[in-house]
Amino acid sequence: MKLLAIESSCDETAAAVVEDGRKMLSNIIASQVKEHVRFGGVVPEIASRMHAEAISGVTRRALAQSGVPLEALDGIAVTYAPGLIGALLVGVNFAKGLSLATGLPLVPVHHLRSHIAANYLTHKNGGSKFSCVR
């Protein structure tokens, strides 16, 4: 199973293609750090606008780097919460558009739960002994 994963919860626009939940075929990140540093922190409106500018190109590059065409994907995963609402809306709406255009299923992903699940990318058994607070 191959998924396109889209992340836009704060100040980085990211897209990756992941195979079988473990193998990263691509991972493209557009950072906004240089833009926000002059303000001393992330400015939500600027972050949202920069996501809107970057998301299409980041996604195109992730698909190209993976060698997997859009029509060969099995689904689209997207961060829906928590995060900056405007930034999240850019990613969610872009993913929804792709889902509607292609007929691919859309999988909403909770950002904090994905940090926990990231253990499955590096540990064969999922790092069965890790703690988290629910």
Residue ranges and their predicted role:
Residues 1-134:
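Short acidic/glycine-rich loops and adjacent helix/strand connectors
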